[in-house]
Regions:
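Intrinsically disordered, low-complexity terminal regions
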Residues: 1-61, 70, 76, 83-132
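Extended lipid/amphipathic-ligand handling interfaces
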Residues: 64
Length: 132
């Protein structure tokens, strides 16, 4: 009744295609699916429900922050899931993982620390990716 957790988005509002490469930070609300590559930080808008899906061929080189995160591909950087994190069998994370709730499938790889945060992770700020 008083639990303030958000529900994962069931629909994808934005898609970064397999042949797309982004250099810079990405901010989103709703559902974002990444099939391509992002070199920069990815963050869901704090005051709106958001879900990030990283597909099997996708790669993110940067810090990731979202309420709900599903990883099938590769993330090179710290991951902050303020609600749920699901690491699928083919996922690979190089960096520390901060989560409220986590599900790790057999075959998932994490090269970093797993840090549980039962309370909301407010105040997490992403540093801007420096060019060059």
């Amino acid at each position: 009744m008083f639990n303030k957790t958000s529900k994962p988005q069931n629909r994808i509002d934005s898609l970064i295609g397999a042949t797309t490469r982004i250099e810079g930070n990405v901010f989103f609300s709703g559902g974002l699916r990444v099939d391509g590559m992002i070199r920069g930080n990815v963050a869901g808008v704090d005051d709106q429900p958001n879900t990030l899906v990283v597909s099997s061929e996708a790669r993110i080189d940067g810090e990731v922050l979202a309420a709900h995160i599903v990883v099938n591909g590769t993330i090179n950087g710290p991951v902050h899931a303020t609600e749920t994190l699901e690491l699928q069998a083919g996922s690979r994370v190089k960096g520390d993982v901060y989560y409220k709730s986590i599900e790790i499938h057999q075959g998932a790889v994490v090269e970093g620390r797993l840090v549980h945060h039962p309370a909301e992770m407010k105040g997490v700020e992403l540093k801007l990716a420096s060019g060059g």
